[in-house]
Amino acid sequence: MGGICIKILNMSTEGLTPEEIIEIRKILNQHIKNARKKARHKECLLCGKARGFCDSHTIPKFCLENIAWNGKLNSFNTLIDSKILNNDSGISNAGIFHIICKPCDGSVFQDYEKAEAYETYPTEKALNQIALKNALRDIYKHETEIEMFEASKQIMKEKNRILSLFVNPMFNAQIRAKKRDVQECYDIYNISKSFLTTSESWIRVVSYDKLDYTCPIAFQGMVPLVTGVDGEVINDNFNHKHDYKIEYLHIAIFPLKEATAVIMFIDSSSTRYAQFEKHIADMTQKQRLEIINRIIFLYTEDYYLSKHLDEDTIRILQEPAKLLQDPVTTDPKRSLRNAVKDYDLRRDICLPNLFSKEYSVKTDD
C-alpha cells in the first residue's frame, strides 16, 4: 500500500515496547480494514454480478510457489524491516485483491496464468490478460488508498483541528493524485476488457527474455517511468492537467520451473517510450535485465523475493526500498527535476542484479 503505509513503515519504532508495537499494529490493521470496506464494490467489476469476491492473485500462484520456501516469501516489508507489519508473506495472501468474483478469476485469465504460456513467446491474449489484471489490482489499491487518506483527514480533524488545517492540503493533494490514478487504471481496464474476445491487439512488446534458470523474484504490474535510459523525461507525474495522460510500462517477471520469463510491454499508441524502446532493443540481454532490475527496485513495492536469498543481498536491497516514497509537492517543475534525478537509471547505485544466474534458485519437481 503506497503513500500512507510507506510513511508508517518508515516510522521509527525505537523506544517502543513490544506491547506498544502490537497496539500500533492493531490500529493500522483496523485502519486498512475499514478503508477496504469503504472502497469495496457491490458487484464483480468484470461480470457485474453480486456474488462475492475471491482472493485474486496479481502474480500467478504457480510462480510464487516456484520461489517460496516452506510456503513463505519475502516482501517489500522485509526490506523496510518493519516492526509494524509482517516481514514475510504466505503464498495464499501474496499480492491478493478483492474486486472480482471466483468464476471470473478462474476463467478470464486462463491464458496467462499457466506455465505453458511461456514455453514459447506469450500470445496477445495472454499479454492482454496481464494488462487487465494489472488494471484491476491497481484500481483496488488506489481506491483503498483514497479511503485511507479520507479517514486520516477525519482522524486528524478530531485529534487536532488546528494541525489539520496545515496537513489537509497534503491529504487533498494525495487524494486528487490517487483519483487520477484510478481513472487512468479504468482506461486501461476498459481497453483490455474490450480485447478479451478478439485476436486483435493494442499492445506493443518492448522486450521478452526467457532465462534457463529460476530467478528469486516474482513481479507483475505497471510502472509510470519518469525517465528513460538517457535521462529523457517519459512521464511528468506532477503534471495534473486534465489532458495529460500517464503512459505505463507493464512488466511481468514470472519464475518458472528451471526458467524465468521477463516481459515488458506498452500500449501501442504510446509515444513517449520511443527512445527507451530503442535503447532496450540495442542492449545485450545482460544490460536489459540490469535496467529492469533497477526499475523494479526504484519504482515498485509489489515484488516477492525468495527466502533463499542471503542476508547480505537483502541488506543491500534495503537502501532503495527505504528511499521509495510517494511525494506531494506544490512545485511541479522542481519536483520533476528531482524525480528525474532520483529515478535516473544510469546513476551509481549498488544493486544486486537478481536476474544473474548466481542468484538463481532450485525449484521442486
Where are the language model's segments positioned?
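Low-complexity, intrinsically disordered regions enriched in charged/polar residues
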Residues: 2-3, 18, 126-130, 160, ...
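Context-gated lysine
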Residues: 7, 26, 33, 37-38, ...
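Non-transmembrane, interaction-prone segments in cytosolic or luminal domains
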Residues: 28-30, 55, 59, 66, ...
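Generic detector of well-ordered alpha-helical segments enriched in charged/polar residues
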Residues: 22-25, 29, 128, 132-137, ...
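An N-terminal structural lobe/cap that precedes and organizes the functional/catalytic core
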Residues: 2-121
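Charge-dense, low-complexity intrinsically disordered regions
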Residues: 175-365
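Internal, well-ordered alpha/beta segment that forms a basic, Gly-enriched binding/recognition surface
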Residues: 73-176
